[in-house]
C-alpha cells in the first residue's frame, strides 16, 4: 500500500533508502530501487551492512544482493539504533568484535570512523573512531592487534557526545558483551567470524583463487561473464566478456591467437591498471572500463553492472563490433549502425574514385 501511495505522489516525494532513510546519494552511493519499487537502498549502505552476503542466483538482485536478503537486513536494522544519531537502521557495525557501535553509512563518515574499502581484495570494513588503526599489512593482523591491545576510550569532546552512550546501553540491557557484539552484526543466525562475508566482492582471507581484474570475482560468474582467463606470469585474470567490451583491449586476429582469451595480454594489463581509476556508474567500485559509446556520455560500467542497469550491448562478431550504450542512449545504436554503413560506403566510393584517377593518369602518360 505504501508503494502505491508513493507512486501517486510521484514528483513531490522522492524514494528514500531503507537503511538510512535519506537521499544522501553523494555520500552513500547510488540509490538502487527494485523493479517492483518496493525496496530501495543506497549501494554503500548495503555494501557495508554486516549481515548481507552476495547473491549468485538468477533471481532479481539489488547491487549484487538478493532482494530477500536486503529486506531481511532492513528489518533487522529497525532494532539497531545508530551510535551517532540514535535513529534505527544502523546495520553497519565496528569490525572489532567487542565493540557494539553501529552506524548508518553517512553517520560513520560524520563520526570520523575509518572506512576500509579494497574491492580487489574483497575488503569492506568499518572501524569506529575509538578503534581506528593504520599501517597494518593485512586485515588478519588488524584483528589480531585489536584482540591483543585494549584501546583506551577517547575522552568526550562535548556534552552532546557524552550523552551518546546511554541509548546504546538501554538497547542492550541484560545482554552479555558477546551477545551485544553478535546482535549488532547480525551473526545470531550465522556463524560468527572476524571476517564476515557481506559484500558482492568479498572473499575469505584464505581464498587464493584467481579473480577478474575488472569485476573482482572469480570463476563462479563464468556463466554470465564468460570464461575466466588466467595469466599466471603476471598474476592476472579476466572474464572474457569483461575484456571483450573494455574500451582499450585489443583482440588478436585468428592467425595470431594467444592463450589469454584471444586478447593481447599487454592491452588487458593496461586496461586493468586503467580500471583502478574508473568507478562504475552503478556500484561505484573501480574496474569499470566499459564506457557508453556516446562521446559526451561519462557513464562507465563493469560488464554485469551494465546488464543490471539495462544498458544495451551490441555484439557483432563478423564485423568485430562490441559496444555498449547506457540506458539513456540505448536508442542511438541503430543510428550509429547507419552512420557506420554510410561511412563504409563513402570510403569505398573514395577508393574507387582514387583508382580511376590513377588509371587515367597512367593512360595519359
Curated annotation (Swiss-Prot):
Zinc finger (C2HC pre-PHD-type): 14-52, 209-249
Gene Ontology annotations for the cellular component aspect, listed alphabetically: kinetochore; nucleolus; nucleus
Cross-link type Glycyl lysine isopeptide (Lys-Gly) (interchain with G-Cter in SUMO2), residue numbers: 173, 227
Segments carrying motif Nucleolar localization signal: 157-169
Region Extended PHD1 domain (ePHD1): start-end pairs: 14-132
Phosphoserine modifications at: 138, 145, 155, 183, 199
Source domain of life: Eukaryota
Motif (Nuclear localization signal): 13-16, 129-133
Modified residue annotations for Phosphothreonine: 358
Keyword Iron belongs to the record: no
Compositional bias per record (Basic residues), positions renumbered to this chain: 157-171
PHD-type ZnF: 80-132, 278-330
Transcription regulation in keyword set: yes
Biased composition (Low complexity): 354-365
GO molecular function, one term: histone deacetylase binding
Subunit note: Interacts with UBTF. Interacts with the NuRD complex component RBBP4 (via the nucleolar localization motif), the interaction mediates transcriptional repression activity.
Domain remarks in the Swiss-Prot or TrEMBL record: The PHD-type zinc finger 1 mediates both nucleolar localization and interaction with UBTF.
Name by which UniProt lists this protein: PHD finger protein 6
Organism: Bos taurus
UniProt gene name: PHF6
